[in-house]
């Protein structure tokens, strides 16, 4: 708090704010007094009751003064000085309120405290006359579960009730009376209840009179507005009925289910709301019945039907009657016949007046003087029944007879004059001589009665001209009472209707959140016998009802007096209604039941109001910005006054002399006194704030007047020029309206700001300056655009009549004094008028800044804001001049070109007619005119011109070496030309102008100053590299294509998108104008209604490198491209499994055709081809396997098996010989049967369908058969493609990526550079892809960017480093080696999975892996030249620790018996750990298929032998008894081995051997075997308790037992895999011997079955 207080009062001193002055009501000639006994704390708010008051100080304390009968201490009942309410100390109160005899306060935390009189429960305490001290009121919402405490923002108190406004903008009420708005019959209400009728609406403020309540409610947003229903919600009857008689139509809307139920005063507090009746009756004060009549019905404004020819007419003198529900009529009123006759006579009288020559029609005083229509209200009629209804006029008994707006011409004043003439006239007419207060009361009642005839449902009569102005297109039906229609009305009905344009500002979320809303409604309820509810009658209302005639009036504040109400609008006007006994309404001598404008001050607007018991106060802006206080209401008689005993009041509001007091910030009214809070103006701070607020409110009034008097009529004119101009004018109007609304909101917020703490830092104009700066900028831009397009000239013709008629108004509004100024000039100045306001903001903010220390943050902020507004004002002035300069240019420019070049936002910067500039090498007679606009450079020649957009224009001076001192080189995407200026100075000017224009075009912000300090820094020259959009018009390849992306010196360079008109699109990287780098390309295929789609690498405008091409036909190619063709390794998928011909090819491509080695999987035929290709056909050696087990290897020619080949069937039948077609034998050959018999000779025919044989049958001898059988199998693979010839393209691509033209030929450093580039590029591309790299992948990539350095002798450590690097490199496909491994794995799986899983292919698969190892090892040795060649030994840097005894020899040695200890370098040792785990599944499947028969025999034997318990099995296998375990340790317990024990002996060794199936590489499998032998040794040592040496005879049976118990399903496959792929140097070492033992066990188990 302290810091706040300090900053807000720094300029003033703390005792010069919130001074309290008190006047006695009725004696306004007296000077005010200071509040007796008040010390001088700054008062923020005061509230007055009948005989007491409450003060709220700046530090949140509350003081009471006056008569306080509820206090318990006698000394406190009439305190001599204000009394501190100690119960509230420490709670920090933010607002206070008083009723007649009670008070309330709201704390910072939203809690309500009440004290004072409580007879009616107004303090929310039950059964207690008085509440002496402030006590908290519990307000909780029972609708929530659990019920939540409700936080309160504002309080309002009446005589017997209190209203509270919650943080969620709902009203809570307690106390007694219908003014609570609650649906209840029991009073008092001591527990606060929600006013349900307004639940869900945003209530902005509440106010309480003695016995009535007001609420200011925010209008619903447009989308929430609903059309009025046709039928009543309660009783489902039609709201409007139409009765068709023979000669006339009667339209009645007498049905009324009022929201507020009408009750007589005596009943108001006794009854709950009765069921609404379709024919409501209103009871007057004595209980007599009279019928309500209504004058006006709103009709559908959009109706385009004319009823001139229809039968809707009405008999001239017919008046409908209705039954009166009571026999008695009020003696003080004329009867219904009298009224009817009077109305008829009066209308005839008005006709006569209208027909008199030379006389103006009578001026009608509107009830609500406002010419702007309700911009937010919904259509008030339903679409069906009402469209053809006629505007109706009231008869005296409540039935409407179709007529015209004649009732509008019927002057309300005359009706009033009839009942309210001077007392003598009244006496003469009524036959009564009474002239006292009773008579006046009667007159008021007559007045109220008469208004009720015209104000039912809160609608009112308006001046016919205002109606037409607002209604715009509202139609008049041809009336039936033609004889009564005035010529004026007929002329108006015949006039052609003009269009109306609604100037509704759009809902701006930001502004509406920060500033008070102007879209408001007023809702009232409670007692209404004085008309204080404003509904046009004197009936009470039990529930809130909207005062419709205040809709759209922008009410921002409400005040309620004893029995009158005030509404303050954003336009600084006050509407008042209710009792006017003492002239408290400020406008006439009579009361009014509908709101009317108060006539306070003709020159100045009202910005704050207060309503007392029977008077009103108005705080008014004055010329010197010091608020003036007007008083209107009760006037006490001066001494010796001998006037009659009638109440006295002011005729018009009286200005009180209070200028010497200071600046009044707030006024409060009670019963007999009123109070003002005053600020002294020490350093001009307060005066400056008042100046800002006052000028803002006046500015809003002026803008509103321009909007309603000028803009709206202009927009409704016909023939406003071209569509563009009309749109621009509408945009101007829309932006003007938005700005106007913002100013209105700001004016309203400043009014409430002046009543608060007045902190400089919370000024909206400074805190949220962008809101204002943006609105002004937008508005100025739209006006400038309108000006450039010649909008004001085009307006001249259609608007000339209107403007001439309103010339004085125009001059007055635009502040033009010179009478000779042209109309268009005035209009121009009027449209640019709002911009001047920015200077005022800057000036006032600067004034405010000078009130603070230069070092304070307030000074800095105010100073910055001031410079912001000033710089924008200057900038917008400059923009206006640019617009005028451009307009004058267009006037001189040749007409044909103007149409195509003239655009609203285009501004002229300079042109070559006044700055000599010519085209280099131009023809002698050619005319070249260069025009620089803010968005383009135009080159005009004779009647043609070319436009060069500035975003894609580069300008640079030619150097002197180029031979042109004054030359400028202009580069655009498709042109390049040189301009020669006359002088070096001209060259500099043009270069600077073009550079600045290009820079601004690229920024896209024009050159608006940056908010927050000065203008933006101007760059010397625009960037060479930039982003822009351009459509090509010349280039043959790119004609009509649009490019959007990065540019460099006139060419696409960097990321961009290129679109052709035919639908082709490229999105990706460009280099020097061509596609280069990574990109995506789409080509529509109209025939298939799909598109081809390529994603991948490009080079110099062509597909080049890795990519994926998806064809419209459904084919997908993944692989390498070169010059837009498939070239290199690639995979082509054709069709899907469900399509007609699914197939897959993976292999080498040359110039878009299959060539070299490839694998083709024909899924339909179930065949797979693995071999050589040429020109898209199988040509050369190859292998085919089928799903039925057939295997062919041999020659192919033109896709057919042709030449020598070998064919094997599933049952091992072999044919070796010549072929002529697929599976067709033709020529010499040998057919060998599975049992060894064979036929040699000539064969012809297709395999499987009968073969013709001419030859010799051989049956080999018994002894030869076993020996010769494998011969045929040994030849397998000879006619297949050699392993090293396979996948050459994959390896060549990898070498190319390393920068080598052929394997091993290149520089190592260059290879490493290429790896680094590949990693960086791929990482960058990965960032743009949707797949996000994990943290570990990112770390791997970072570690790969480090190149391993090896200096000195090669060691095991360096070897391990290389191994680690390879593992990481092969883990990421972003590395060339990783990509190679990924591709090899893909091709291997493609080859040997599915149909390729054929046991005949096992040896090919093993050879292929060995070939991979050899070729990858070559790559690794190229990258690491220090790595020794295959089979070399790396000496150990330190001998391995001894200790493990050699298993077989007993020697204490570390390794195998290699000649010297060391580490052998092999390709399999280095690369198999990386490669084999990835290839293991297909490879192991082939081993399993190949050993299928052996494995079945082995497994059957394993299952049989494992049925035996341990002891029996050990004995069966011949294990020596000394090795039998006697005891076993199970979970730490020693248990004896029994004869039934099973699966317990050597359990650790069994478990260890089972791990063999979980490893991949031979070396890992051998380690598992070695570990198993060690586990066996440990077990034996434990039982023998002594050292021993194994012999093979002892060891083999034990190991055989372990193998059996391990139950390894595919042991044969494991054995063969190790045998095929283990390092040769291991064969004769320790691991080799162990492996041989395992192999022997496998064969032994198979033979066990034979024993």
UniProtKB/Swiss-Prot annotation:
Pfam families: DH_alsin (PF25389), MORN (PF02493), PH_alsin (PF25383), RCC1 (PF00415), VPS9 (PF02204). The modification Phosphothreonine is found at residue 504. GO terms for biological process: behavioral fear response; endosomal transport; endosome organization; locomotory behavior; lysosomal transport; neuromuscular junction development; neuron projection morphogenesis; positive regulation of GTPase activity. InterPro entries: Alsin_GEFs/MotNeuronReg, DBL_dom_sf, DH_dom, MORN, PH-like_dom_sf, RCC1/BLIP-II, Reg_chr_condens, VPS9. Residues 684-879 form the DH domain. PANTHER family: ALSIN, ALSIN HOMOLOG. Residues 427-437, 450-461 have a biased composition (Polar residues). The gene is Als2. GO terms for molecular function: GTPase activator activity; guanyl-nucleotide exchange factor activity; identical protein binding; protein homodimerization activity; protein serine/threonine kinase activator activity; small GTPase binding. RCC1 repeats lie at residues 59-108, 109-167, 169-218, 519-570, 572-621. GO terms for cellular component: centrosome; cytoplasm; cytosol; dendrite; dendritic spine; early endosome; glutamatergic synapse; growth cone. Keywords: Acetylation, Guanine-nucleotide releasing factor, Phosphoprotein, Repeat. The modification N6-acetyllysine is found at residue 527. It comes from Mus musculus. CDD domains: PH_alsin. Residues 1507-1651 form the VPS9 domain. This is Alsin. Residues 895-1001 form the PH domain.
